[in-house]
Amino acid sequence: MLTIVRGPVGSGKSRYCREEIIKVLKEAPLGPMVLYIVPESATFENEYLLNTREDLPGSFRLQVLSFSRLALNVVREFKAFFKNSSEFVYQHTLKKILQENKGKLQILQKAADNPGFIEDLLKLFKEFRRYRVKPENLEKASSEIENWMLQQKLKDVYLLYKLYLEKFGEEYTSEGLLEKFLEYAPKSKFLAGAKVFIDGFYTFTPLELEVIKTLLKTCAEVTVTLPTEYDPGIFNRLYSEALNLGIKVKELKLEKIERYRASELLHLAQNYYPLLPDPYSGSLENLSLIAAANPLEEMEKAARIIRYLAKFKGYKLSDILVLIPEDGYYISNIKTVFNEYGLPVYVDKGLAFDHHGLYFLLKGVLGEFNREAAINCLKSGLLNLTADEVFALENYLLSRGLDGEKLVLKEAWEDPNSSYWESWEKGFGEIISFSQILPLINTYREFSQSLKQLLLKIGVPRRISDENGERFWQAFTNLLTEIEEVFGAERLNPTTFAEELLAYLAKLSLKTIPKGLDQVRAGGSKRYWTGEARAVIILGAVEGKFPSPPAAGLIFTEEERAKLKKVGLELSPLIRQRLKEDNFHVFLALTRARERVYVSYPRVSLTGESFTPALLVDWLKKAFPNLKSEEGSYGNETTPQALTRLLSREMVKVKKNGELPFIAQGAFNALLLSKPELITKIARAFATNPGKIKLNAGFKEFLPSKTLSVSRLETYYSCPLKYFLKYLIKAEEREIFTPEATEIGALLHGAVAEIIKTVREKGQKLSTLLAEDLKTLVYQAFTKAQQEYGEKFLATYRGRYFLNRLYLMLFKAIEALAYFEGFTKFTPFGEEIAFGEKERLKSPVFEVNGEKYTLAGKIDRIDVYENNGKTYLRIIDYKTGSISISLDEVVGGINLQLLTYLLVASENKELFGENLVPAGAFYFRFQNPMLDEKAEGLSMEELKEEVYKNFRLSGYALKDEESLKHLDSFYAQNNKFKTVNLRTYKDGRIDNALTPAELEALFTKIKGLITEAIFKISAGEFSAIPYQLKDATGCRYCSYLEVCRLEEQEKQYRVIPRKKDPEVLLALSGGGVGDEKLDSRTNAGYHLQG
């Protein structure tokens, strides 16, 4: 007998099955089997639901099974041959079949080399078996299809599928098991007289329908449940099959929807399918639409909702179901977020092998042995090294730039007798030996056995202590054994095979079951969820994620599948049908809860990509006109981790009334890790000043020393939070060897200083040296600087290549400096001259609120020229990067260094004399300029002139004729400059030339800026307010973006007006901007060190 139970979602179809099962077992605890067949993902939960029923008598009759587990039980009853190869063996065998028959393929020959083609082909073959497609069906279809391209593709697929089945036809994949079930079921005692309940399905594949047909012929009674909202012809097919078999059919309709305790949820269930649903006018206490800034905030809101429901509404955690998109971010992070809120959660996803240490070890062992491979091995935690040794060795490898052959050469290490080398030998001796023999391996058996032996020698099984690790180890060793058994003495390319094996392991996952009973359940909306939930929370309701778009057809396009269907070759549903299925999944998600539904969507991704709410959101607003998107928070925070996360983000939001503090997300976490004692003070500061963004006076003890550098002050004006993280928290990136600008700069600065010093001490001039002498001088200075600053560059080929480039850059720069020296009366006074406490140059002292702060730094080069009792000063600062400077940047505080150095030098009258004239401050850029096509046809001298134009000094000069003509003698004769970037006009104007009054006004402004920065730093003002000057911002190239993570719409910029130099000077012409007001506010003062 066949009973078809039909009814809408929530009408109690599953409850009917369970009640009937209990009724049957109560009537007869002994007898034929009672089988409850449900989707694979629901077997555990349904078994638990039935076995925890107090009214269920003990019985051996009941089994809760999936279709494949049912088939397995029947096949085992006959002790039939059973073998199930791994997915990897299927893929690799299919790859070998493709390689051997590639020349016979017409259409798929080129596609065979595409990444993922093997996986797609294997999925297609599994689809064939589910839909009972045999090679002869493909051959028949190819003769009936008129389209030549499809005809040839069918012939290609026919050939490969035929060979695949010859290899694996007898193996029991899940599809193969069902086929074997059809063979053994009619003779099965296990099924004889059984009562079967098939529940939780809304459609069946042809193979599953054939299984049901066999059950009808074999078992006493079969009951199938079907939803009325979605029926792709299944009811009629079951009905007609039963009638054809002469089996009585009973239809039971459950029309009353009993699930919902909230009227709005009942309205939702009854009105989902019409495009224009009836509007609901009642209260909306149990239906919520939530908008979040991003997926992370969305998950946190969900966690707070769950805490609220558990604390105030009496929900058990198992009463709550969270449905999430099946893309990586939600699946990967929801457990971490919920755990921070003290919520145990079962996430319906497999255990990913590539998250375990064993994978990292294999990745290091099987790939090319280099620094990255070594670090992967260290990350595994499976080497014979302590945690301290692993940490120290990883940092050593990264900071020293050791790579390639240098890793295994003892003499290449900085100190071969140190503990680093001992740790290296202890941890990597066996791995290095294996990496040397790996390319020599010839067969699959050798590969498998050698890899097993290595892992045993390292002691991997002893160090895997976690339950998941043991499962991964067992799965991997089983795979190696299978490879050895299946492929044995066949020859292989070990490098290619290792890459293929790693690619497979990266996608491998193991099934999980819930470890606890009272925990939140989370997973994809397309999964079958057993039983009713009191509350459902849907996350990620945006287009393209909820529901996820249907996958494109594999190998065959949608158009080709439609043509195949016309000639009788039925495969999985076309996209139109799959879209209907997806819509039904959305409906199931919405109607799973009996009391509350929360639908949530993020506005943007964590990378700033905008999202469009899903069609579901629009439908809900039509069905419930009073439903509004809620932006607020939910519940109270009770865990320290959650509170820290919440505080850090709430501080970056700016309320419309401007009351909320503005500080970057992640600052508190950084504080907690670096200086726990700061947390209390920060909390107290914000608690006592909720409307401000200042840390209280107690923070002065944690401020850096009262000696400040100009570059630090520029950092503060770039973004106060950046200053806070870099200099107070001292949050640093791990040291990794790369030719950074700081190291390049140190090497070049050191070499130039050595050259200028050598020439000055010998009483010579660069401009008078012969070309060979200049070359020798540059080589000697570069070699010396390389020993002091460039040792790391020698560690790698890339580093040595950079050294060669730097040498050429230095030589061209010295040639340019020598050339420029012939046009100026200024001569070097000193190189790398420091100012500050006990330094050659006295430092400015700034008094702020009774505290003294000293400026310190180092000037790359000071040149002087003496004439008529006056001493003219010129500052040169060497740069390896951009050398642009404008006065709006100076008064904005982000480019203070050059003119501040001139200010410091010009106030050291004890050293240079009373009649001191600041003649100018300039950048000189190290570079390797290239000439364009305009240079064709120029003489050698003209080419040199073109090259030297690129090296001209860039900055500001004093607008004083006496000073200018000695600064560049070419100007005195030609009224234009050759060595500096000053541009002259016929009316006497000179760009970048400042009158003494203008220069003095700039100096006053700079003093005010330094004073104000000191005041704000000492007052604890570290808000996340980066500067913005036209398109440039303080966030550009910032190392702390991952800590800050301010959303673009949340940023509050300190806008520096874009002004030309004359406009800035005009604004300063009144004697500075706001200096008197500043002094009044900060009680500031200024003087030179005494």
From Swiss-Prot:
Principal EC category:
hydrolase
| Domain of life assignment | Bacteria
Entry note: cofactor:
Binds 1 [4Fe-4S] cluster.
Q: Which UniProt keywords apply?
A: 4Fe-4S, ATP-binding, DNA damage, DNA repair, DNA-binding, Exonuclease, Helicase, Hydrolase, Iron, Iron-sulfur, Metal-binding, Nuclease, Nucleotide-binding
Q: Where does ATP bind?
A: G7, P8, V9, G10, S11, G12, K13, S14
GO BP, sorted A to Z: DNA recombination; DNA repair
Which GO MF terms does the UniProt record name?
Answer: 4 iron, 4 sulfur cluster binding; ATP binding; DNA binding; exonuclease activity; helicase activity; metal ion binding
Further remarks about this protein from its record: Despite having conserved helicase domains, this subunit does not have helicase activity.
Summary of subunit composition and partner proteins: Heterodimer of AddA and AddB.
Report the sequence similarity comment from the record: Belongs to the helicase family. AddB/RexB type 1 subfamily.
Q: What does this protein do?
A: The heterodimer acts as both an ATP-dependent DNA helicase and an ATP-dependent, dual-direction single-stranded exonuclease. Recognizes the chi site generating a DNA molecule suitable for the initiation of homologous recombination. The AddB subunit has 5' -> 3' nuclease activity but not helicase activity.
Protein's recorded name: ATP-dependent helicase/deoxyribonuclease subunit B
Gene source species = Carboxydothermus hydrogenoformans (strain ATCC BAA-161 / DSM 6008 / Z-2901)
Question: What's the encoding gene here?
Answer: addB
